[in-house]
């Protein structure tokens, strides 16, 4: 009997992206399996944010091929977006709204049916252990609570792929552990695939099934943390691996696209102003 091969959660083939003369992503090929946690590592300016924006269809693919659960990113953008939860680096909460209202706004954006909306919002808040404070203004939340609220926003449409771009940056170790405890619980419950970018090497080592390390837009290494550490030296840490692949020929912290980041920030703020008026 012939076995049907399930599509990869993420399937990148020769992705290349240019900002003018600057190559942000250079002929990148990568597969992420359904249900795994993949860490995307690299120094500032390595191309991680540009790659994440392509994976979430916020930036169209220029060259190469990208499929998310078998869907072509050029032809099935709407279907892909409905299947992805995304927590960007920039804060995406509206402080003047309650935690519940913030998640409700995302439920509307994702097209969650009105009849299901209240239950789905409550479930997302409960998953991040925020239901007890759901009716407090988000502006009164701690840093860790804000990040958990953003994950709740991303979970309200029950995505198959959760993309977390520096989700615990600036948080203390206890708050970081709190975020990851809840994310891992949801992943175990629903079998989500998780793509994580982080500069915390110990976090990537502990949480990721595999890691992919980028430098100068090029994918330099892919493997389990144990595999990559063993290739560098006996007793190496993941930070040693990072330095091994990324410390030579650094080009400085060149921004991947300041205009794109500012535009995204303006879009987020505009959406939140609309949400505030609507509520």
What is each of the regions a protein language model found here?
Residues 162-165:
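Catalytic Walker B motif of ABC-type/P-loop ATPase nucleotide-binding domains
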Residues 222-223:
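ABC ATPase "signature
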Residues 137-141:
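Conserved ABC ATPase signature
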């Amino acid at each position: 009997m012939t076995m049907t091969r399930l599509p990869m959660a993420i399937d990148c083939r020769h992705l290349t992206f240019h900002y003018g003369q600057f190559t942000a992503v250079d002929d990148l090929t990568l597969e992420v399996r359904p249900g795994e946690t993949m860490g995307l590592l690299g120094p500032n300016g390595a191309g991680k944010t540009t790659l994440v924006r392509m994976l979430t269809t916020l930036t169209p693919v220029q060259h190469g091929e990208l499929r998310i659960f078998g869907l072509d990113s050029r032809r099935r953008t709407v279907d892909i977006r409905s299947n992805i939860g995304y927590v960007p680096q920039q804060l995406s909460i509206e402080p003047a709204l309650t935690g519940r209202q913030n998640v409700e706004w995302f439920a509307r954006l994702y097209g969650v049916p009105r009849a299901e909306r209240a239950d789905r919002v409550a479930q997302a808040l409960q998953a991040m252990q925020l239901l007890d404070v759901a009716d407090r203004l988000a502006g009164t939340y701690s840093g860790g609570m804000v990040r958990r609220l953003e994950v709740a926003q991303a979970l309200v449409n029950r995505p198959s792929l959760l993309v977390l771009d520096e989700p615990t940056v600036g948080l203390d170790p206890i708050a970081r552990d709190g975020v990851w405890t809840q994310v891992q619980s949801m992943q175990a419950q629903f079998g989500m695939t998780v793509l994580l970018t982080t500069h915390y090497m110990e976090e990537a080592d502990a949480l990721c099934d595999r890691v992919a390390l980028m430098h100068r837009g090029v994918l330099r290494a892919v493997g389990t943390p144990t595999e990559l550490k063993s290739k560098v030296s006996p007793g190496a840490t993941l930070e040693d691996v990072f330095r091994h692949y990324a410390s030579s020929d650094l080009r400085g912290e060149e921004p991947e696209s300041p205009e794109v980041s500012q535009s995204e920030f303006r879009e987020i703020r505009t959406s939140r102003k609309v949400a505030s008026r609507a509520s």
